[in-house]
Structure formats: structure tokens, C-alpha cells
Amino acid sequence: MRARLPAKLGAAVCLLLCAWFLAPLGMGIVHIGMLWPSALLVLAAVRLLRPDVFRRLLRKKWLRWTVRAALGLGLAAALGIFGWMVSAAANRAAPAESTVIVLGCQVRGTEPSLTLQRRVDAAADYLRAHPQARCVASGGQSDDEEISEAECIRAALIAAGIDPARIEPEDQSTSTEENLRFSAERIRAAGLSTNVVIASDNFHQLRAALWARHCGLTPYAAGCRTAWFLAPGYWAREIAGVAYTLLT
């Protein structure tokens, strides 16, 4: 069956979006947020170009309706979580002198990755604007990192002009949940404000806020943008991460 021009254009858009999601492969990056949207986009392109294939596969009416219902519910849930994530990233009206928590991510050798540097920059901006505020640099060390994420964050903040005495390192965490749980322990031990400004990517703010509230903290956002070629996959991965957090 020969596809019509609108179907061909739609399929081309799907494949271009698929290429965008898979772009980080060129940097050796692979994660679930790149894979599940790409698979759905390829299926959508095939559906547009060869609808007869899907008609043969979904001959039974009950099966067609089951697939449609599952896709519809999944899409509605994903859009709902996406809207919630955007709202969480906009929650920036923190009380004066809140405690900053910088959430760690990949360190390249001893230097921050592009993503981590943007988080450090967001934290440094807040700390310069609030000279009495303190900061927790949170993140452990993985096998391919020469120093802990906390140590890297601390060094980058000092290089940005932040007084070392204002920075409390937390170098044991290996997940967002541990970032917030261990940071909450440090904050209480040091007698710091439990109003916290979370310095992380915009896509990460919702899940971080959920864990912060679970740990008895009141979260606000100091979000930063993700590099354009990384953003689609990380937002998609985080949608799955939020869904998993809510279900477990």
C-alpha cells in the first residue's frame, strides 16, 4: 500500500524526533529515556507508512481497543507527569537564606560534566544573591570517577567565588533518594534551614522535591536548562522515574 504525502511527512517527523532522542548515542550515552520514546516513534512511523501491517496484527476488535486504551492511558499519564514536572521547576519563591542542595551527576575525571557545571552555576547564582545561605554538595563517587561528585561540586563552587565555609559536602549518596535523605541529615546536624533550594536540572526538580518532602524538607527550585541534544531523553527518562517513584 502506497502511503500518501501527509502520512509520509508525518513519518518523517517521527523519524527526525527519533534521531533527536538517540543523538546522545554519539557521546556514548544510553538510557531508558532515549529508548522507549524512540521505539514508539518508529512504531508511529510504520503505522503511518504501512497501516495494513497493523490491521493484520490487530485483527480482533478487543485487541485493537486494548492497545488503544493502553496507549491512551499511557499518553495521558505521561502528559500529566510532564505538566507536573514543569510546574515543579517553576517553584522558585524560596524564603530568604534557605539551604541550597546541589544534586550531583557525572564527573569526568576530576572535572564537572556539562550538566553538573550548570547545576553548580545555578547554586552559585543563588549563594551570591544570598550571602548568608549555606550549601550541601551532594553526590558519591562511581567507579569511573576519580573524585566524588560532592568534592567536584565543592571545588567548582569555590572556583566560582563561594566561601568554602559555606559548603557542606555529602559524599555517600548514589541516588536522588539518598541525595535528599543524607543531605537532610547533614542539614539537621548543622542546624541549617529545612527550607531547601534544589540546584538541579529543571526535569529533575519534581522527583527531587518529592523525596525532599518525604525527608521533612520544604523544597524550592533553582533549576537549570539541559543541553538541547540531551534534553528529550532526560525528560522522558524522568517521566518514567516519577511514575516509578509514585508506584513504589
Language-model-detected regions and their locations in the chain:
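Membrane-embedded alpha-helical segments of integral membrane proteins
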Residues: 5-53
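Lipid-exposed faces of alpha-helical membrane segments in multi-pass integral membrane proteins
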Residues: 9-19, 70-76, 80, 236, ...
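Transmembrane alpha-helices and immediately adjacent membrane-cytoplasm interface residues
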Residues: 43-91
